[in-house]
């Protein structure tokens, strides 16, 4: 699957893409459908592991910023669901570790991952300030806002999410987050049923602008697709001047939001 991802990056770059985000845990099946310690072997160091090093070369070759979600080993027995961010010159910029970890049928993630401990970093890249918010995290508005307060202009939501209530929410939560926080959101999903379980991943990757409008159409819900869209970064200033949500925040009244 690494070869497929590298080919997808090349395809996107050939169509003019300047930043590419891959799906959650991109280089293998979504193994969290089962609880099997054999999949601990999928971990690797970030950035010193072979996949990050390869992707640094790929990013430099194509001149694109890369967001690469992987299974990270910090030390033996300590694992995270992590996205590496690589600049267009091939320089590794840092990583986001998924903070919110689900544990329900078909998504046994607590068996594999510790909750992240790096907060909500935003990375200065060749295309602007980028944040990452992985899959299940999208249900938590606090992280979206933290990324906005840190200056994010584009937030990527790489996911592995399947049909059911989630499919309805897929068209609600990310546009709402884009509007409330006045940035672009790129949301990426797997497609189809994998041999490990019954999850039917519904694809439908898309970009949404800070007005809550889709940029072009969403991708197919049954076929893999490389989604390339043109984002007008000037729209960020237009929206923020019109809807001054950050000006009108009242953090002094939000104390209850951070109480356990």
Q: For the regions a protein language model found, what residue spans apply to each?
A:
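Active-site catalytic loop in hydrolytic enzyme cores
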Residues: 44-47, 57, 74-153, 163-176, ...
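A conserved C-terminal secondary-structure "cap"
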Residues: 234-260
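Cys-nucleophile CN-hydrolase/nitrilase-fold catalytic domain and related Cys-dependent amidase chemistry
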Residues: 2-89, 95, 161-181
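Residue-level detector of high-confidence beta-strand sites
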Residues: 82, 95-97, 157, 217-219, ...
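CN hydrolase (nitrilase-like) catalytic-core segments centered on the catalytic cysteine
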Residues: 47-67, 129, 135-225
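Short beta-strand scaffold segments in enzyme catalytic cores
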Residues: 68-70, 82-85, 121, 187, ...
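Structured C-terminal cap/extension of enzyme domains
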Residues: 209-211, 221, 230-233, 239
